[in-house]
Amino acid sequence: MTQSVHANRDAALKSIIGKKVQQAASELTIFAVKFDDETGVIFDAVQPSSPTVAARLVSAAELPNLAEAVCSVDWSWIYGCTIDEANAGSSSVRLKLSSVGPLTIGTGLWEGKPFLSFQPFRPAKK
């Protein structure tokens, strides 16, 4: 299962390079990004053998509604950015966003369940 998670993630990461972020939302285990071409990507915290970030490309209509998430983050600071690079680590994904720099999506465990973490979780001070 781990190999398929990584293969799907790698394919999704390749396909989002050059796309422009229109909206984004997150909750504890999901980060959903909508692009200006009516596609999106969903990053999930999963635990096939150890916590990792899964990713899949979807149509914008398939993106979850995370507007009322308990642990919501204001992602407006990445709106309008283009994804210049998208790289996978063993348990994380690093996106290089035009004009704001890198965003790392990591995973961890809380009470045996995986969750997502973000660095930075807000824009850097200029």
For the regions a language model picked out, list residue spans one by one.
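Surface-exposed, interaction-prone regions used to assemble/regulate multi-protein complexes
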Residues: T2-K126
